[in-house]
Amino acid sequence: MSIASDPLIAGLDDQQREAVLAPRGPVCVLAGAGTGKTRTITHRIASLVASGHVAAGQVLAVTFTQRAAGEMRSRLRALDAAARTGSGVGAVQALTFHAAAYRQLRYFWSRVIADTGWQLLDSKFAVVARAASRTRLHASTDDVRDLAGEIEWAKASLIGPEEYVTAVAAARRDPPLDAAQIAAVYSEYEALKARGDGVTLLDFDDLLLHTAAAIENDAAVAEEFQDRYRCFVVDEYQDVTPLQQRVLSAWLGDRDDLTVVGDANQTIYSFTGASPRFLLDFSRRFPDAAVVRLERDYRSTPQVVSLANRVIAAARGRVAGSKLRLSGQREPGPVPSFHEHSDEPAEAATVAASIARLIASGTPPSEVAILYRVNAQSEVYEEALTQAGIAYQVRGGEGFFNRQEIKQALLALQRVSERDTDAALSDVVRAVLAPLGLTAQPPVGTRARERWEALTALAELVDDELAQRPALQLPGLLAELRRRAEARHPPVVQGVTLASLHAAKGLEWDAVFLVGLADGTLPISHALAHGPNSEPVEEERRLLYVGITRARVHLALSWALSRSPGGRQSRKPSRFLNGIAPQTRADPVPGTSRRNRGAAARCRICNNELNTSAAVMLRRCETCAADVDEELLLQLKSWRLSTAKEQNVPAYVVFTDNTLIAIAELLPTDDAALIAIPGIGARKLEQYGSDVLQLVRGRT
């Protein structure tokens, strides 16, 4: 049979064909986005089996997700049916690392660990929580989740409890809690898994650790395993952790029949322990390795590919040295567009309007995605799509109002509303959110930071509402939030996809909107804290590259100059767009992103519009100078403290700081002047008015 007529070779381009026909032995396929790597991998496996180099049962293909493993198995079965060679390539095992290790450990366990049994932990949460308690660490739910994540990172990085503190410092990693505390919890966690009842608890990392140890330390096990599997294929090799590499090395032994496929410039999971160094060092470990580059992109238009190339061309560091120069193979399409907006609601409204036009012109909603850096950014887009009547689904996360921390916040606000407080709404909201995790600075832990981002988004949403309706009180706010929550479409497969850039890896759509591309969000602020030229910042650049390469035809990139309508426009476009995005102006909003709710309050000093609840309370811009009677302010605070103690309520329930400042500035001398200050209603006038006016009169 000629190559042209061989169904395992026909239809491949010359780069793919080179990879498929490479001889047995170490092969490294550097495959860019959209270059057909899965097709190339499966055809290589089928070719090796069909040519008799290896039996189907002796091949082990591993990847990182069940979805990817399932896709590989499906394609191998299809090739088996199409080739009609009788090779049985459809029987090749394509598994995740953990699934492969689970099967192997179950088979070898009794031979290497004597008579003790084992049980797999579906979740380590309960054991980590118990370990934290036994070390006298008072850990919240988010703390426990962050501790579990940190233990996973350590084990994936082959770092034990006794080495953790030193390793974290050497890696310049920001642990979610004190490193010594984490090490103590980690040590206790490992001790708790050895229950002493004849059953050992194993987490998913233990599957890999015990599998590697069994092969490394038992010659009979190694011989049996290495006789069973003789050829290995690893997909997404740039995402391998040191622990997974240890397992792979144990599988191989002193052999080199290994094919790896990856792209170091799509390494975006370093927080899990993934490292591109194994891909970058492949030719050093195997000097005779064949290296094939796949650079023909069949997914995206030349216009999208060109932008991706320009973004990654500016990359720095060792990873950048392996970058591929993609060449778009599709028909030309529209040029990617760049849009600057005055604020986030305007950005979201414009994106929703653009999506509506795409859908009207025939693009299925399921072929459209909105991608952002952090999950908390989804709220404004959920609202905009809801207002536009466009169904959506949130991938890799929950809808904003379905998140646990938001449900907790709304419940807490409902309880406060039952106390009939007249305190300034913004202050009430922040006081309620503070115990739930809203701090002045974002926490370090991943889960705690996600909670903080969601709570911050809720607080900013309240500020947006107050800017439009300065007289808004808590019952009205809760009604508005309930309206938003109830109006949100339930997740539907046919809807527009909302996803973080991390969750979008491995997926593609006809149209992609990359939103919120402002410095401090992408690259994210905690990456910038490591320095502008640091590896964390470079990983953020790779995130943008991954996002761009998700688009087949339509691609729009956008950012907002401020969070809220009328807010200070201090944001800048992502530094990754420097020299790429054209000079832009803030785009006009299609229609209005918020309902017109009457004239805005204005500063009593400069007459500018007031856009925050604090400014409305003070009746001036927070930057405008004003005379505050400092002695009166101290007296008011002292009076508030004693009154709050008498009534057994928080101080803000009596009056907030901003209300006291307004009183000390405006010096009201009668009931009419006092009640004119926002935050002082009829009830508070009746309850506290005489005391306050007596203090003011004593100073005037």
Curated annotation (Swiss-Prot):
Residues 565-595 are annotated as: Disordered. Residues 601-700 are annotated as: Not required for growth. Residues 626-700 form the HRDC domain. PANTHER family: ATP-DEPENDENT DNA HELICASE UVRD2, UVRD / RECB / PCRA DNA HELICASE FAMILY MEMBER. Disruption phenotype: Essential for growth; the 100 C-terminal residues are not required for growth. Its EC number is 5.6.2.4. This is ATP-dependent DNA helicase UvrD2. Its cofactor is Mg(2+).
